Each structure stands twice: as C-alpha cells, then as structure tokens.
Amino acid sequence: MAPKGLDDFEVTMKKIAILSLAPIAVLVAWCSGSVLHAQTANEAWQMFLNGGQPDLQPNRIRVQYDEPTDPQLRTVYEIMMRRKPLHKVQEIFSPLRLPIDLTVKTTQCGMSNAWYRRPEVTLCYEYLRELRDMAPTETSPDGVTPVDAVVGEFLFTASHEVGHAVFDLLDVPLFGRPEDDADQFAAHVLIRIGKNNAPQLIHGAAYMYAEYIKRPTVTVPVAAFADVHGAPVQRLYNLLCLAYGADPVMFADVVEKGYLPKSRVPACKTEWGEVDFAFQKLIYPYIDRTLLNEVLSKSWVPYAKIPIRRQTDAPQSQSMR
C-alpha cells in the first residue's frame, strides 16, 4: 500500500494530465470539423471523448418569446404568449437528436421575415401579424378555416426554417437549392405529423398562395427569378404535388378542384417517393422513435378561434417566406 502522500500526488498528476488534454481535444475537434457543432469548450471536450462525434440528444429545441417595443406588435405578442405556439413547434421537433440546443424565437425585426442563423430560428412579429391579417375572416368556400390557414402556414414556415437548421447541424448533404430542400422538409413534416391533421395543415398553408392560383399570369421583375426561393406559385404546386403523391385519396380534391394542374399529377408519386426516401435515409437516423410516436399520436390543429382582422383592415403586402 502506497503512502497517503503518494496517493494524493498520483491523483493530482492524473487531474493535471486530464486537464492538459482539454486544449488538445478542442484542437482535434477543430481539425475534424466537429467543433463547428460545439458551442462551448465542454462540448468540444465531449466530442473528443466521443471520438470526434457530437453528443446527439433529443429534446434540444428551446423557445423564446421576445417582447416587442413597437406598440403595433403588442397584440401579436400577447396572442403568442397566450397560445404558446412555439411550444407546439418544440414538441413536434423534440424527437430530433441534435448536437446542440436550437432556439426557436419570435422577435421584433423591423421587417416581415423568418430565417435560421445558428443556433437560432427567428420568426418576426411583423411576419406573424401579416399572417394573421391574410387569413380568411370565416371558412372559405373551399373549407379552409381561419385556424387552418394560420396554423398551417405558421407550421410550414417554422418547419422550413427548422429544416435549414437540421441540414446545417447534422451535415445533411444537399443536392439542390437549400430553399427547395427546406420546403420539402416542411412538406414532409406537415404530411407525416398526423394523418388527421395533414389535410387541414396542407390546405391551410396552400391558402396563403391562393391569390396566385386565381391569376393566370403574374407579372414580376426579371430579377425576381434570381431569388433563392422559388416563385410562390411554384412552391404551391410543389407542396400540393407532394401531398397528392403521398396520399392520392386524402388529397384527391387538389386535383378534382383544379388546384394542381393535371399535367403535373403523373409525376407526384415519384416526387413524393424521392423526398420520403431522402428523409428516411438522411433524417430518420437522427430521430428518437419513441418520441416520434408520441408526436404522431397527437392533434396539432387547435379548435379555439384565432383573432382575425376584418378583411378591410388587412394590409396589401402579401409576401411569403
């Protein structure tokens, strides 16, 4: 048995040796590229212990409701605080196993927009106000309720931005435009998070593009075709095509009512198959199946009414994310 003093000396030397490895761990993680996922030195150290791989965990979505300074955004902020829709987003994406926490927040931006910038997804109050004002004041002739329109478009936009985050944080390879891939990610989420909700969510999201369906031609500046997003009418047809391809029976009305041109219909099953295959191969390995089953068992469309402005009070701007 070694003298007590020698034991203490050995313990101290071991601690020094371990601590001296921390900078090396950070350097190794940096050289391997995995430090890009680390927010702190502790996370970089954990990556080193995991062989350079990030510590993937579910339940890493955080939410934040920033209080706006603009009095005109106060009503939207109060609605968000009462309804807590970001908590729904948090729950829907809780099965994702991510290397770091991802914060989804609402805030005042000075413009109507939404975006992802690591480690945050930002949804602007100006956009949410516009979304509220664009919704129908009553159930539309096509059966879209104000709740369907608001919830469907809100979840589509939130899912689109979370899609950008997933591609970034999990190093998901893209073989196309990031905005198109984020749209496909969002469409897959809305179609898959519950068959009872899928028609309401898809039709609600599609409602926001309805004005483009009614116009046979739309005049836009040539520079608009250089935008990173597809044209709104293209995004609409892509969304409807994926929905129809996923379930031709459930979404038969998108063809029967002429929302989706019949010339596009034959390709929809293949298009959905490609998106679903990519999701299975690239996203599902990072999903906690137990939590996913809990998400799939729930309803995500509320029955409560959402305060809607009178149609005459709605602003003219109808930009889409």
Label every model-predicted segment.
Residues 21-30:
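Bacterial N-terminal signal peptides
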Residues 123, 156-171, 183, 187:
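Active-site recognition of the HExxH zinc-binding catalytic motif
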Residues 177-216:
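Post-HExxH zinc-binding segment in Zn-dependent metallohydrolases
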Residues 76-101, 131:
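Zn2+-dependent metallopeptidase catalytic core
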Residues 69, 75, 169-185:
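Active-site metal-coordination segments of metallo-dependent hydrolases
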Residues 105-122, 127-136:
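Catalytic zinc-binding patch centered on the HExxH motif and its immediate surroundings
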Residues 134-156, 171-174:
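Short pre-active-site segment immediately N-terminal to the catalytic Zn-binding motif
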Residues 46-61, 221-321:
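Pan-zinc metallopeptidase signature
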